[in-house]
């Protein structure tokens, strides 16, 4: 997601107050960084608990699809499915995209946790997909519930960890930040730009990439790609300034086929 218009407009100016809060939070966040373990490319258990797989490798149990113009639970054109044990976003039954964006929501909300997803882009974008959506998916974190989505709503209010695949030439980072209906404090100020780029490498072709995100409630988030820190920010909030302490997890269907080998969560101490 990037290049599309914001869906919600800010209803209240945040300004100096949250910027100062971000500065005051800095020392706490720094202390947590020192205590946090480095992300593991492999592994199941840590001192804080056990990685839990959100995807069982067989079907969509625990997940609910929602497409623009369709009720929650309707898997439009069988877009989300399991293929050879991989959670797949497929467009082989589509002829034209027509802006029917979709999301697949996990059943449980989370607050303080790490999420680790192994993903890749495959095939070609479906006809009619927007240019910015080519080789584009996302982990929608701290999101609204699928039940609260309106029938024609494009995207859930959430913090999006934008997953991008590289093109033939040029740089195209992944694990970026996009903010549908939200803002964050970035570089000690409330940043209202819709998308912010990470400092990751570019990943071309159909190679598998591991994206891990450390989420600490309303305090802040950190993105890692293949174990390397890609970006960090604080105080995730709705457009009206309400801090987001917890929310749903969903993946996207934005017009390009995508596969997930695994999606795991490790809940961490507050």
Task: Kindly label every feature range from the protein language model.
Residues 15-26:
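Bacterial N-terminal signal peptides
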Residues 28-270:
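Carbohydrate-interacting regions of secretory-pathway proteins
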Residues 2-16:
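Bacterial N-terminal signal peptides that target proteins for export
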């Amino acid at each position: 997601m990037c290049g599309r218009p914001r869906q919600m407009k800010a209803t209240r100016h945040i300004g100096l107050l949250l910027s100062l809060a971000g500065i005051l939070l800095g020392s706490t966040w720094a202390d947590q960084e020192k205590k946090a373990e480095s992300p593991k490319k492999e592994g199941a258990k840590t001192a804080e608990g056990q990685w839990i797989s959100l995807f069982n490798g067989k079907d969509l149990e625990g997940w609910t699809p929602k497409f623009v113009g369709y009720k929650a639970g309707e898997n439009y054109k069988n877009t989300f499915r399991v293929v050879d044990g991989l959670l797949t976003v497929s467009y082989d039954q589509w002829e034209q995209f027509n802006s029917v964006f979709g999301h697949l929501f996990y059943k449980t909300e989370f607050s303080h946790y790490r999420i680790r997803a192994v993903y890749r882009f495959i095939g070609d974008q479906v006809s009619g997909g927007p240019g910015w959506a080519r080789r584009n998916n996302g982990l929608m974190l701290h999101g609204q519930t699928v039940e609260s989505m309106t029938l024609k709503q494009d995207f859930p209010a959430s913090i999006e960890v934008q997953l991008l695949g590289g093109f033939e030439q040029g740089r195209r980072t992944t694990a970026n930040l996009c903010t549908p209906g939200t803002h964050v404090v970035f570089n000690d100020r409330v940043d209202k730009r819709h998308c912010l780029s990470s400092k990751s490498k570019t990943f071309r072709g159909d190679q598998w990439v591991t994206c891990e995100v450390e989420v600490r409630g309303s305090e802040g988030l950190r993105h890692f790609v293949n174990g390397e820190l890609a970006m960090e920010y604080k105080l995730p909030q709705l457009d009206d300034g309400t801090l987001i302490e917890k929310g749903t997890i969903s993946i996207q269907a934005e017009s390009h086929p995508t596969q997930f080998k695994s999606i795991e969560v490790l809940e961490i101490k507050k």
